[in-house]
Amino acid sequence: MKGIFPIDKFRTLQTPFYYYDTKVLRDTLSAINQEVAKYPSYSVHYAVKANANPKVLTIIRESGMGADCVSGGEIRAAVRAGFPANKIVFAGVGKADWEINLGLEYGIFCFNVESIPELEVINELAAAQNKIANVAFRINPDVGAHTHANITTGLAENKFGISMQDMDRVIDVALEMKNVKFIGLHFHIGSQILDMGDFIALCNRVNELQDKLEARRILVEHINVGGGLGIDYGHPNRQSVPDFKSYFATYAGQLKLRPYQTLHFELGRAVVGQCGSLISKVLYVKQGTKKKFAILDAGMTDLIRPALYQAFHKMENITSEEPLEAYDVVGPICESSDVFGKAIDLNKVKRGDLIALRSAGAYGEIMASGYNCRELPKGYTSDELV
């Protein structure tokens, strides 16, 4: 089963490029809103790092989500797309002074703080602007996630967050400061997580920490559990919308949320992953000693995930219905790691065929680079190509 694409329109465009199916995106956003409506205390922020294409951001903002940003540039992108500043949260282990000042100037909802030195800088910069900054502390819960090692973020060995044993001390420091207001706790254990048991483990850890704080009569208004929900890379046509029902229900059943608390989520991949495809043209079919190579005009500069994470993306020859043959699908970049997949079954490939690399809406266009002096790929939505 292949995806449905406007192939005639594609033939008029310079490849490679990203294509975003806005129906899939809107269906995904609708599914999220349908589930979140069951839980009045839930609030969802879109993780801008997954995809900051302005046309994509605008559709997401129209759904009512907030924005989760990890740089000053992302804050600007979110504001340009119309996200209200009071629905923007700012995370990241290394926030520069100008980025903190930018967040203060816009009046964003919250800074997710990852160290005492960062807290001290935020307090100092807020004082200079005569403002009080809302802060939540990102706690490293030492919870592992069943995902690639490079995208785990909740283990003690990771660079992210404040260790659990330091939580009390950091909160005490914040409570003595005049220009920061401690409002919450933040967690994020990793990305592309499909095992709900990982989220249950996080809930158990959050419950423990909440009990500990309440014993000290410290009440926390906001709990932010990050995101991490994965997508089905193997079956983008069969499961284009992730299982948000199970995801949100897991937290409803396992997290002991207090009546006065708001629970925040930061979803990225699960929002945009399945709506995007990288469209590439076959330059050559090369017969090697033991295998055939399909050489594309897209490479690791356009979609780095296979080279960086050994990630799998389903590939489809969308211009051929001939019998399947096995190919190593590679790009033109001068790196041996510029390989999208080995022994991939595709309908017989010829020069000029269009290959769609599916489930590329997240961490695709946004991570593209100009290595080898290549131009960045453009992004088009289905709304544009009607």
Question: Which residues make up each language-model segment?
Answer:
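A charged N-terminal "starter" segment
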Residues: 1-133, 172-181, 211-218, 345, ...
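Charged (often Lys/Glu-rich) extended helix/loop segments that serve as interaction or gating elements
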Residues: 3-4, 260-386
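Conserved, mostly hydrophobic/aromatic
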Residues: 25, 49, 71, 103, ...
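Hydrophobic "anchor" residues on beta-strands that sit immediately upstream
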Residues: 45, 134, 222, 262, ...
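Active-site beta-loop-alpha junctions enriched in small/polar residues
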Residues: 47-53, 70-73, 93-95, 114-116, ...
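Short acidic, glycine/serine/threonine-rich loops at helix termini
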Residues: 57, 80, 100-105, 122-125, ...
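Hydrophobic residues within beta-strands of alpha/beta enzymes
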Residues: 67-68, 88, 111, 185, ...
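Active-site loop/helix belt of alpha/beta enzymes
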Residues: 142-284, 346, 372
